[in-house]
């Protein structure tokens, strides 16, 4: 909740939440979460948040060549439920998958990850 409030007060046009996922060791890839229209607290942000999420997912997966797991609507995350600006939560890979984890820990690959996200943000604003 506090991060969403901070983002709201920052004057930013969007909020991107960076996460790494966990599951069984054979699960890998990237997903991006956004608020659904069914959530009355953020329904008005859903369409823009979905566009932002899709742009980030497509660009990030193109840059990193990580498996694209898709978009997910979520209504149970305080970081999105308190947002007043379009918001996307990117699960950048799986820490429990050796391949994803090793890449995410590599500093040069982190630059590739950042570029993928930045390109998605650029696409959103075009």
Segments from the language model and where they lie:
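Active-site-adjacent mobile loop/cap segments within catalytic or ligand-binding domains
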Residues: 17, 21-24, 33, 68-126
